[in-house]
Amino acid sequence: MAISALIEEFQKVSASPKTMLAKYKAQGKKAIGCLPYYVPEELVYAAGMVPMGVWGCNGKQEVRSKEYCASFYCTIAQQSLEMLLDGTLDGLDGIITPVLCDTLRPMSQNFKVAMKDKMPVIFLAHPQVRQNAAGKQFTYDAYSEVKGHLEEICGHEITNDAILDAIKVYNKSRAARREFCKLANEHPDLIPASVRATVLRAAYFMLKDEYTEKLEELNKELAAAPAGKFDGHKVVVSGIIYNMPGILKAMDDNKLAIAADDCAYESRSFAVDAPEDLDNGLQALAVQFSKQKNDVLLYDPEFAKNTRSEHVCNLVKESGAEGLIVFMMQFCDPEEMEYPDLKKALDAHHIPHVKIGVDQMTRDFGQAQTALEAFAESL
């Protein structure tokens, strides 16, 4: 299949998650909403259910969620709750709500209260000190509890063999997405910022085996494609999420292609595979989480060395990017607290960057357009 045809298929999925949810429900499958961050989707997949990403939405008018949310909650949390309240996500059979930040922690209880008569809400508490034996055991126990709740929803046991099989499916998918990011950097003429974001976003709304099969086909076509002409600029993007239509249009208009990303919604979520040489599936998933790093949401035992900021700087250099765009989610405390150290490292490495505030309620992207245009001209 041609590259353009494959991209069009991903665009259809990305543009209409509700259609995908309805499709899977029509097949008799149950679906579980997975909120940010680091949900062990393998457990949902192993249960024979469909994991559906719930990371807010763009431009929805908040009405009912304001009754539950403080004004300083990020719009990812508010928009996710709004969709649950207004019926957009009524097809879900439950949701998993991790609590890795100070907004999601109290928000998990808002989800529980708001959804008490509609669907089960599964609480997931990851440990911050996750690398040692106690941290891995904590993660194991937390995942085991999630597994029990999922078994209540699906109506049968989630076997260890099913989890091990799911890990293989997900590792294959993560590898395909990492390869796609590499190929997108090699073909900015074929994969502009909006297309790259669309292809990666589609993973949240498809069963991973189906998604990976289609993505591997796209990767094969990209690998065989000749190098094209690109007269724009390559950049690295960093932040929680940035795929608002206005932002992506502004990047495409100013010929800013993405060489690599340091985003929670994208590469951070598929950077680490689960080991396949362990006999216990839950243990393998706990080990996987223990190896997650370079994320503002996670405790870094080597924080004094500013390892995360150095990681971002190295990402810019190794990808061949000319600069960095920091997309700062409004009211995201971890991102805001990290920025001074990140800026210091970027300046020390003489890496041009621009910081742009993003919000899922934004309707006028004129300010972002101007900032991106000025940044492109400065490169």
From Swiss-Prot:
Top EC class of this enzyme: lyase
Family matches, as PANTHER family: 2-HYDROXYGLUTARYL-COA DEHYDRATASE, D-COMPONENT-RELATED, SUBUNIT OF OXYGEN-SENSITIVE 2-HYDROXYISOCAPROYL-COA DEHYDRATASE
Activity regulation comment: Activated by the HgdC. Reversibly inactivated by oxidants such as 2-nitrophenol, 3-nitrophenol, 4-nitrophenol, 4-nitrobenzoate, carbonyl cyanide 4-(trifluoromethoxy)phenylhydrazone (FCCP) and chloramphenicol. Irreversibly inactivated by oxidants such as hydroxylamine and nitrite.
This protein's name: (R)-2-hydroxyglutaryl-CoA dehydratase, subunit beta
UniProt catalytic activity: (R)-2-hydroxyglutaryl-CoA = (2E)-glutaconyl-CoA + H2O
GO molecular function term, any single one: metal ion binding
A Pfam family per the record: HGD-D
Cofactor or coenzyme needed: [4Fe-4S] cluster; FMN; Mg(2+)
Gene3D superfamilies: 1.20.1270.370, 3.40.50.11890, 3.40.50.11900
Assembly: The (R)-2-hydroxyglutaryl-CoA dehydratase enzyme system is a heterodimer composed of an alpha subunit (HgdA) and a beta subunit (HgdB).
Family statement: Belongs to the FldB/FldC dehydratase alpha/beta subunit family.
Source species of the chain: Acidaminococcus fermentans (strain ATCC 25085 / DSM 20731 / CCUG 9996 / CIP 106432 / VR4)
Function of the molecule: Involved in the fermentation of L-glutamate via the hydroxyglutarate pathway. Catalyzes the reversible syn-elimination of water from (R)-2-hydroxyglutaryl-CoA to yield (E)-glutaconyl-CoA. The dehydration mechanism involves a transient one electron reduction of the thioester from (R)-2-hydroxyglutaryl-CoA, generating a ketyl radical. Prior to (E)-glutaconyl-CoA formation, the ketyl radical is subsequently reoxidized by electron transfer back to the HgdA-HgdB complex (CompD) to avoid change in oxidation state of the substrate.
GO cellular component assignments: cytoplasm
Subcellular location: Cytoplasm
